Every structure is written in structure tokens, then in C-alpha cells.
From Swiss-Prot:
Record cross-link Tryptophan tryptophylquinone (Trp-Trp), residues: W112-W163
Organism expressing this protein natively: Methylorubrum extorquens (strain ATCC 14718 / DSM 1338 / JCM 2805 / NCIMB 9133 / AM1)
Quaternary assembly: Heterotetramer of two light and two heavy chains.
GO MF term list: aliphatic amine dehydrogenase activity; methylamine dehydrogenase (amicyanin) activity
Record SUPFAM superfamilies: Methylamine dehydrogenase, L chain
Note describing how the cofactor binds: Uses a protein-derived tryptophan tryptophylquinone (TTQ) cofactor.
UniProt-recorded name of the protein: Methylamine dehydrogenase light chain
Alphabetical keyword list: Disulfide bond, Electron transport, Oxidoreductase, Periplasm, Signal, Transport, TTQ
Enzyme class of the recorded protein, top EC level: oxidoreductase
GO terms for biological process, alphabetical: amine metabolic process
Tryptophylquinone PTM positions: W112
Entry-linked Pfam families: Me-amine-dh_L (PF02975)
Compartments where found: Periplasm
Length: 186
């Protein structure tokens, strides 16, 4: 076993050897590269196709949402497949449609997105939820669906935010939400 002084001598010799063969700038550059690389990890693409099968397979007795099955018949129903992540009122019940606001309301320029599964063609689609603003809440067809919802620190996937701050003419009062298809998600 090495004594204390032998250990100190060995460590000092190795430290001096490493210091003699490397520069401070090189070390700082490598640390900077590592920090930048770690910061860029959240920007990498992620394959979430497995989430659809897990979401549809979830059958929880304590969770009423566990039995939620998307359907493709009644667009004014909360379980219509495009409404998988809607948190608000469906515009189709207020004189609008899946893609247009009711008369007297303005379309907000901001949106949030979700990937919803269509049971008819067994495909997932990217839905861009946009709020219609400028009239009082209709109260008809109110839905609280949270399929694929993420916490508020990812606001582009957050359905708890009222997105009327981008509407024309300062129409800040929420009325309903439309759900147009952006494209295929998978």
C-alpha cells in the first residue's frame, strides 16, 4: 500500500503530466462544447408513434379518461377524434365549424398543437387548436380533453392557456376553439 507521501507524489506527477500536455484553452473549449451539446439535446427529434398505442390501450378503472375512445361520427361530441386535446368549447356548437369561427368572433393568431388519432383511417394527425375570441363563452359543448397535454413549460402543447392575446381588434374574450388538421403526424 502506498503511503501518504507516495500517493501525493504520484498524484502530483500525474497532474503535472496532464497539465504539460493540455492547454487551458483546449480544456475550456471542450467544456464549452459539452455544455452546448447538452443544451441542444431537447431540440433533437423524438419518435412518439408509440404514445398512440399506449394512450389507446390505457384502461384505468379510477380514471374516467382511461375509457375514452375517439370516434369519427359526431363532430359536436367531446370524443370526436380531432378533440383529443381540446380544453374549451367546440365552435361547431356555436355556429362555426371545425375550421372556422362563428360569426361575430375573431380568430386568434396563436395556437397550440396536438397529435390526434383518427380511428377511421388509423392515422395520427397534427391538429392546430386555435381560439375564437371576441364574444362571451357559449357554454355549449364544453370539453376537457387532455390526450398528449404537456405541462405549461411547453406552452405550444398546453391547452390550459387562453390564446386570445393574439386576436384582432383586442378581442380578448374567449368564445370557442376550432381544430383544423395541419397534416399527418406519423
Amino acid at each position: 500500500m502506498l503511503g501518504k507521501s507516495q500517493f501525493d507524489d504520484l498524484f502530483e506527477k500525474m497532474s503535472r503530466k496532464v497539465a504539460g500536455h493540455t492547454s487551458r484553452r483546449g480544456f475550456i473549449g471542450r467544456v464549452g462544447t459539452a455544455v452546448a451539446g447538452v443544451a441542444l439535446v431537447p431540440l433533437l427529434p423524438v419518435d412518439r408513434r408509440g404514445r398512440v398505442s399506449r394512450a389507446n390501450a390505457a384502461e384505468s378503472a379510477g380514471d374516467p379518461r382511461g375509457k375514452w375512445k375517439p370516434q369519427d361520427n359526431d363532430v359536436q361530441s367531446c370524443d370526436y377524434w380531432r378533440h383529443c386535446s381540446i380544453d374549451g368549447n367546440i365552435c361547431d356548437c356555436s355556429g362555426g365549424s371545425l375550421t372556422s369561427c362563428p360569426p361575430g368572433t375573431k380568430l386568434a393568431s396563436s395556437s397550440w398543437v396536438a397529435s390526434c388519432y383518427n380511428p377511421t383511417d388509423k392515422q395520427s394527425y397534427l391538429i392546430s387548436y386555435r381560439d375564437c375570441c371576441g364574444a362571451n363563452v357559449s357554454g355549449r359543448c364544453a370539453c376537457l380533453n387532455t390526450e398528449g397535454e404537456l405541462p405549461v413549460y411547453r406552452p405550444e402543447f398546453g391547452n390550459d392557456i387562453i390564446w386570445c392575446f393574439g386576436a384582432e381588434d383586442d378581442a380578448m374574450t374567449y368564445h370557442c376553439t376550432i381544430s383544423p388538421i395541419v397534416g399527418k403526424a406519423s
